[in-house]
Amino acid sequence: ISALFDEYEPLNDAD
């Protein structure tokens, strides 16, 4: 998910 939400990762706190 970090790849998609690289600039916006609030849900993606783990990765």
From Swiss-Prot:
Stimulates synthesis of ecdysteroid in the testes of larvae and pupae. This is Testis ecdysiotropin peptide A. It comes from Lymantria dispar (Gypsy moth).
